[in-house]
Amino acid sequence: MAPFLSAHGESASSSSSSSPTPSRHTRNQHVDYSTPGSTGYNIPQNTTWNAPSNRKIRVLTIGAGISGILMAYQLQKHCENVEHVVYEKNEDVGGTWLENRYPRAGCDIPSHAYTYQFALNPDWPRFFSFAPDIWAYLNKVCETFDLKKYMRFHVEVVGCYWQEHAGEWVVKLREHLPNHEVREFEDRCNVLLYGAGVLNNFKFPDIPGLQDRFKGRVIHTARWPKDYKEEDWAKERVAVIGSGASSIQTVPGMQPYAKHLDIFVRTGVWFGVIAGNSGSQAKEYSEEERENFRRDPKAVVAHAREIEEQVNGMWGGFYAGSMGQKMGSGYFRTRMAEHIKDERLLQGFSPKFGLGCRRITPGDPYMEAIQKENVDVHFTPVESCTEKGVVGGDGVEREVDTVICATGFDVSYRPRFPVIGKDGVDLREKWDLCPESYLGLAIPDMPNFLTFIGPTWPIENGSVMAPLHSVSEYAIQLIKRMQNENIRSWVPRQDITDSFNDHVQEWIKHTVWKDDCRSWYKNNETGRVNAIWPGSSLHYQQVIERPRYEDFEIHSFNDNPWAHLGMGWTVQDRKGPKEEDVCPYFNVKNIDPKWYEACGGDSRLLVERPEESSQAGQQFLWPTGT
C-alpha cells in the first residue's frame, strides 16, 4: 500500500539506507505526557469525524453536457459544504446534443438506455432518439432539479494550472458577453472535473484543395449551418465523405431531398441490430405506451432493463474467435445481404475485419438510402479537390456544389488548452504520442483531476450512462475523503498506471480490436488501441466502485496526517441520542436468523424487519426459551 504523505510530501515509512531509524523512545528520556502541545503538535479542536463542516471544497467542472449535468445533480444531492461551478462554452446545456444539428443527428443507443438512472424518461418519442429529443430531456433534468444555477454559459476554459502548495487548480477563463466584448478572469478549485467529452473537437480531413481550392460550400457535420436546409439540397449535387455514425445518419436525412449524393467510403461498416427484440429502428412510442410508462414506473424500468440486458449481452462477441463473434458476424452479414440487394454495394460495405472492431451501427435507413437512384457510392477515399468538385482515389473528378465532411473528431484525447499539472507537466504533451489513464478517469501528474470518458473507458459496449454514473460516485467518494481528512492532493502513481496499461494492451490481443480496421478507438497510424476498457461495462462499474487509495500518492494539509481524527468526536457524539443513532450496531437486521431460531424465536420476524424505533424495540420481545 502506498504511504500516506505529509504536507511536505514525506512518507512516515521512508528511511535512510545509510543509517538505522532512530528509536522514538529511549531510557531516561524525559517526555512531557501531560501538557497539550508540548511536542509542537496541536490537535485541531473543532474537527469532527465524517462531518462535511470540517472543510469547504470547491469543485469546478468543464462542460455542461451529459457529464457536467450529472455531476451537478450528484453533488447537489450527496454533498454538503461543497461549492460547485460548471463552465460551458456554449449558450446552453447539452454538449454534443446541442452542437450537432445535421440531418437525423441522434444516438445509436436506444433511448431508454440512454438516460440517467435517477431520471428514467417515460416520454421518449422514439426507440432511437434524435438530437433535439435528447437535448429536451437533458434540459428537463436541469430544470427539474434546478441545476443551471451552478452553470455559467458562454465561458470557455483557456488554461488550467496546478498550484502544489495551495492544493488548488487555477483555471483561466474567457467569457463572451452579450455586447460582443470578451472578459478574461480566473477561478480556483480544489477538484477539477474534465467533462468536455472526447467527441467534441471536430476536424476537417486533410485533403489537398478542400479549404483553398474548392469554390463550393464545405460543411462539417458537427457544425451544420442552420440555413442549409432541404430546399438547398434539392438544387445541389452533394459529396459526403465518410462512413461513420454521422454519415450513416446524415445520408438518409438528405437523400429524399437532394438533387444527387456522391458518397465516398473507404471502410466497411457493420450495420447491426441493437436491442432488436425491444423495438425496430424506426419505432415511435405511441401516446398509450408513454402514458403507461408515466403511470407505472415499474413498466419503464422493465423496458429499460430489457434493452440494457440485450445491449450488454453482446459483450461476449467481442473476443476474437469466440462463438459469439462467429454467430454475430454471420447473422449481421446475412441481414446486410437482405437489405442491400446491389452486389457491388454489399461487397463494398461488407467489413474485412471482425464484428465490433469499428462501432456497430444501426443503419437500416442508410442501407435503404444508398440504393436510391439519386445516390452513387464510391469505395475510394477523396484524394484532392478541384475548383468544381472532388477527385477520388480512382482518379475520377466528380463535380459537386457542396462537400460534407462526416469525418468525425480529433480523438487524441489531448485537451484544446493547457492543462499544467505537477512539476510543469502539460497534459497535451503527456498525451501527444500515447494517451494513457488510470482506470479511464485519472492521470499521473494531474492531482485532484478526474476526466469523464478518458482513454481506456467502456465506450465500446452499450450506453455510457451507467459507467458515467459510477465515475460520478467515484468523484464524490474522493471529495468526501478530502473533506474529512483535510487532504491537499491525490494523484495516481505512474508505476501503477503503467502496469494497468500494460495489462490493457495485452488484453486487447485477445479481442476483435486487434484486427486491422480504421476506428476512432485506436491510433490508426500505429494500431494501438487507446479507447477500450479491458472488460464489459458492468466490469468497469464494479472495478471503480470504491477508490483503491493504495494506488495514489496522497498529501495532507496537516504535518501529522492523523490530525483529522481531531479530539475523537463523531457527528453522532456531537448531536447525541435525541438526534442521532449512537449505537447503530444494535439492529434487528444484524441478528442472524439461525441464532434467533436456536433461541426459540420465529426468524420470519427478522425478515419482516419491524420498524427500528424506540416503540418497535418495546414491542419486539426476545423469546424466553424452553
Curated annotation (Swiss-Prot):
Stretches the record annotates as Disordered: 1-47
Record-listed FAD binding positions: 96-99, 108-109, 114
Stretches with biased composition (Polar residues): 31-47
Database matches in Pfam families: FMO-like
Domain of life: Eukaryota
SUPFAM superfamilies xref list: FAD/NAD(P)-binding domain
The UniProt record lists the keyword Transmembrane: no
Keyword tags: FAD, Flavoprotein, Monooxygenase, NADP, Oxidoreductase
GO terms of molecular function: flavin adenine dinucleotide binding; N,N-dimethylaniline monooxygenase activity; NADP binding
Pathway(s) annotated for this protein in UniProt: Mycotoxin biosynthesis
Residues marked Transition state stabilizer (site): 359
Required cofactor names: FAD
Compositional bias per record (Low complexity), positions renumbered to this chain: 1-23
Cofactor note as given: Binds 1 FAD per subunit.
EC number: 1.14.13.-
Binding locations of NADP(+): 106-108, 243-249, 266-267
Induction: Expression is positively regulated by the dothistromin-specific transcription factor aflR. Dothistromin biosynthetic proteins are co-regulated, showing a high level of expression at ealy exponential phase with a subsequent decline in older cultures.
The keyword Oxidoreductase is assigned to this record: yes
Family: Belongs to the FAD-binding monooxygenase family.
PANTHER family according to UniProt: FAD-BINDING MONOOXYGENASE STCW, L-ORNITHINE N(5)-MONOOXYGENASE-RELATED
Function: Averufin oxidase A; part of the fragmented gene cluster that mediates the biosynthesis of dothistromin (DOTH), a polyketide toxin very similar in structure to the aflatoxin precursor, versicolorin B. The first step of the pathway is the conversion of acetate to norsolorinic acid (NOR) and requires the fatty acid synthase subunits hexA and hexB, as well as the polyketide synthase pksA. PksA combines a hexanoyl starter unit and 7 malonyl-CoA extender units to synthesize the precursor NOR.
Name of the protein this chain belongs to: FAD-binding monooxygenase moxY
Organism: Dothistroma septosporum (strain NZE10 / CBS 128990)
